Swiss-Prot record:
SUPFAM superfamilies: (Phosphotyrosine protein) phosphatases II, C2 domain (Calcium/lipid-binding domain, CaLB), Voltage-gated potassium channels. GO terms for molecular function: monoatomic ion channel activity; phosphatidylinositol-3,4,5-trisphosphate 3-phosphatase activity; phosphatidylinositol-3,4-bisphosphate 3-phosphatase activity. Acts as a lipid phosphatase, removing the phosphate in the D3 position of the inositol ring from phosphatidylinositol 3,4,5-trisphosphate. GO terms for cellular component: cytoplasm; cytosol; endoplasmic reticulum membrane; Golgi membrane. The gene is TPTE2. The chain crosses the membrane at residues 66-86, 111-131, 146-166. Residues 393-522 form the C2 tensin-type domain. Keywords: Cytoplasm, Endoplasmic reticulum, Golgi apparatus, Hydrolase, Lipid metabolism, Membrane, Transmembrane, Transmembrane helix. Residues 210-386 form the Phosphatase tensin-type domain. This is Phosphatidylinositol 3,4,5-trisphosphate 3-phosphatase TPTE2. Signal peptide: none annotated. One of its GO terms (biological process) is phosphatidylinositol biosynthetic process. Residues 1-11 have a biased composition (Polar residues). The keyword Glycoprotein does not apply.
Length: 522
């Protein structure tokens, strides 16, 4: 089994800690989890190990790995496109600007020969890496090889005859048709190089997410289980150059799961015509790097469960933009709802293992955003403590924000509270709060006067012109659900706050950085 991915920053479903005036780092170390590897998880992951082994079997030697990294590199692809353009340009320039009674210059033929030899080497290296049978199973690869070999033979023959026999034969009368054919061949080869470049761009964008690379497909798409697919956005137009082309996704689903799939689009920011997928598309509007509402998670999991129960062949394909954060949140909820796993920790760990391809790098491709982790934990409680129903609604009022150990000048710090997609509180309003920076205790106190009633899913954002902005166009933010607040207190350390959890933000937010909210009830 592969090594576990990097530690999930998830502390469980209860955020509260014993009330203290100033938290210490030790109180907030709970995000470091031991990989929750169970026997059932080992069995489930092992089912995919054969598939993964087959995907990398052709790269089993160090030499093949090195060759594969070279021919699959972006620079190698760009260089290939440049050579095709150069070859076509030289050929056209020679036809247009050279006296028609002269022969094709030996210099041009030599350059053309060198270019042809480069592409012949490219084909041979790819055959070496992928294997002859696998490489030539693709019709485009067969055509590309023919396009390379035929002009190469023409160049070799022409150089030979140009020197020995054909010094008195004008080139136009005998070669114009052949040259036109060669131009068409070169252009077709350029289109094939563009296809290879698109593959490289898609792999660069998807990084080391596990891809489906069988049966002529190369998609940012992962079977999390046999019936749950996670993938990136099915794109068209310019975006299809570096993301999954929607036509290929449709072809894949129709070939593998015809009439037995449903697609879930979790993006609020982009969509496509549902007709592509035969109108079997459901859309849940979730903002990037944010969370679904708890109600949406319950409705989604019940709907998918019902769909799965209708036919054992039914599957779901779930995506957001990159097929990682929002997708992972909902997939983990589905794993818990279907009782494949019982805990949030197990489902989060498993999704990260399935989505990450460690043969390329160890970068974690699971659910990283703290609020998304938190909501998977909430859903686990909904499933097990509330019998898959929403918990009783609890109405709370914010009395005070306490921000610990923030660096820099944040005299213009502002807080905004969002509920049901509307701003219900903003500290910019006159008279609704007071802000005090206690330098001695290194705390910022924001006392809220007559705050609005809060219930269900709540988002809190902080703004300051002196702090760098990251996700959501703000320095830091987080989500919580009022039904899970205990003792009228929520305390979140750095690794449970969205944006400060990322290592690149740690120069601004020290380990002691935390946000605490004190609530009241009326």
């Amino acid at each position: 089994m592969n090594e576990s991915p990097q530690t999930n920053e998830f502390k469980g479903t209860t955020e509260e800690a014993p009330a203290k005036e100033s938290p210490h780092t030790s109180e907030f170390k709970g995000a470091a989890l031991v990989s929750p590897i169970s026997k059932s998880m080992l069995e489930r992951l092992s089912k995919f190990e054969v598939e993964d082994a087959e995907n990398v079997a052709s790269y089993d030697s160090k030499i093949k790995k090195i060759v594969h990294s070279i021919v699959s590199s972006f620079a190698f692809g760009i260089f290939g496109v440049f050579l095709v353009l150069l070859d076509v340009t030289l050929l056209l320039a020679d036809l247009i600007f050279t006296d028609s009674k002269l022969y094709i210059p030996l210099e041009y033929r030599s350059i053309s020969l060198a270019i042809g030899l480069f592409f012949l080497m490219d084909v041979l290296l790819r055959v070496f890496v992928e294997g002859r049978q696998q490489y030539f199973s693709d019709l485009f690869n067969i055509l590309d090889t023919a396009i390379i070999v035929i002009p190469l033979l023409v160049d070799v023959i022409y150089i030979f005859f140009d020197i020995k026999l054909l010094r008195n034969i004008p080139r136009w009368t005998h070669l114009v048709r052949l040259l036109r054919l060669i131009i068409l061949i070169r252009i077709f080869h350029l289109l094939h190089q563009k296809r290879q470049l698109e593959k490289l761009m898609r792999r660069l964008v998807s990084e080391n997410k596990r891809r489906y690379t069988r049966d002529g497909f190369d998609l940012d798409l992962t079977y999390v289980t046999e019936r749950i697919i996670a993938m990136s956005f099915p794109s068209s137009g310019r975006q299809s150059f570096y993301r999954n082309p929607i036509e290929e996704v449709v072809r894949f689903l129709d070939k593998k799961h015809r009439n037995h799939y449903r697609v879930y689009n979790l993006c609020s920011e982009r969509a496509y015509d549902p007709k592509h997928f035969h109108n079997r598309v459901s859309r849940i509007m979730i903002d990037d790097h944010n969370v679904p509402t708890l109600h949406e998670m319950v409705v989604f999991t019940k709907e998918v469960n019902e769909w799965m129960a209708q036919d054992l062949e039914n599957i779901v394909a779930i995506h957001c933009k990159g097929g990682k954060g929002r997708t992972g949140t909902m997939v983990c909820a589905l794993l818990i709802a279907s009782e494949i796993f019982l805990t949030a920790e197990e489902s989060l760990y498993y999704f990260g293992e399935r989505r990450t391809n460690k043969t390329h790098s160890n970068k974690f491709q699971g659910v990283e955003t703290p609020s998304q982790n938190r909501y998977v934990g909430y859903f686990a409680q909904v499933k097990h403590l509330y019998n898959w129903n929403l918990p009783p609604r609890r109405i709370l009022f914010i009395k005070r924000f306490i921000i610990y150990s923030i660096r820099g000048d944040v005299c213009d710090l502002k807080v905004q509270v969002v509920m049901e997609k509307k701003v219900v509180f903003s500290s910019t309003s006159l008279g609704n709060c007071s802000i005090l920076h206690d330098i001695e205790t290194d705390k910022i106190l924001i006392n809220v006067y007559d705050g609005p009633p809060l219930y269900d899913d709540v988002k809190v954002q902080f703004f300051s012109s002196n702090l760098p902005k990251y996700y959501d166009n703000c320095p830091f933010f987080f989500w919580f659900n009022t039904s899970f607040i205990q003792n009228n207190r929520l305390c979140l350390p750095r690794n449970e706050l969205d944006n400060p959890h990322k290592q690149k933000a740690w120069k601004i937010y020290p380990p002691e950085f935390a946000v605490e909210i004190l609530f009241g009830e009326k």
